[in-house]
Amino acid sequence: VCVVALEPPAGLRDTVPVGARLPMTAGSGARVLLAYSDPGTQQAVLPSAVFTERTLADVRRRGWVQSAAEREPGVASVSAPVRDRSGTVVAAVSVSGPIDRMGRRPGARWAADLLAAAGELAQRL
């Protein structure tokens, strides 16, 4: 469920509406949340997902994930987990935009910023 969305003041505007429910089967946000979910949830979702258990292990190893045209054609995204005080992943923070602007490997530009933002959010929880 999307809880916050920010749009640029001008130009392309294509955000996920607050309150929108997105499938857990595609996209960087889904991969982050599923990578840290319980094994039962993973087993229920993975058969219909566009990614694999190995992909989720890569997310846990790296600590963030990127995708290009996975959930929506022409859109690239990067996501990182947000943890509560006990270390449990409770949310994902993401940035997305047109592949033409973000490229097919948007993590090179955005991963460090997202990890910093996730850390700041975690401190406020």
Give residue spans per PLM region.
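Short, surface-exposed, charge-dense and proline/glycine-enriched linear segments
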Residues: 18-29, 77, 95-105, 125
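Extended hydrophobic
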Residues: 48-118
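Short, solvent-exposed recognition segments
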Residues: 4-73
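Conserved protein kinase catalytic core
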Residues: 1, 11, 104
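Intrinsically disordered, low-complexity terminal regulatory regions
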Residues: 1-8, 109-125
